[in-house]
């Protein structure tokens, strides 16, 4: 991530002809360097993602910063569920304090 020197906004990383370019909404652009390379990446499938984020999912209903939606829990009938979004594919998972979980959003 880079910060624009002209307006102090976050710049967005893009790729042009195999080169990393950071662009700002104000029009500024900066050439990326070797420090900005992604060494490795992995896209997790839903089952792997649930294993990777098991503790995060378990604790999500107790974190007041997570989004709560008005939907009854089919397990304990609490009148809301906690909605979290995980992974690069932005998978939506609904969880409840009782342990209920649904990845159907």
UniProtKB/Swiss-Prot annotation:
Keywords, sorted A to Z: Virion
Domain of life: Viruses
Subcellular localization: Virion
Entry GO CC: virion component
Similarity comment text for this entry: Belongs to the asfivirus C122R family.
Protein name (database record): Uncharacterized protein C122R
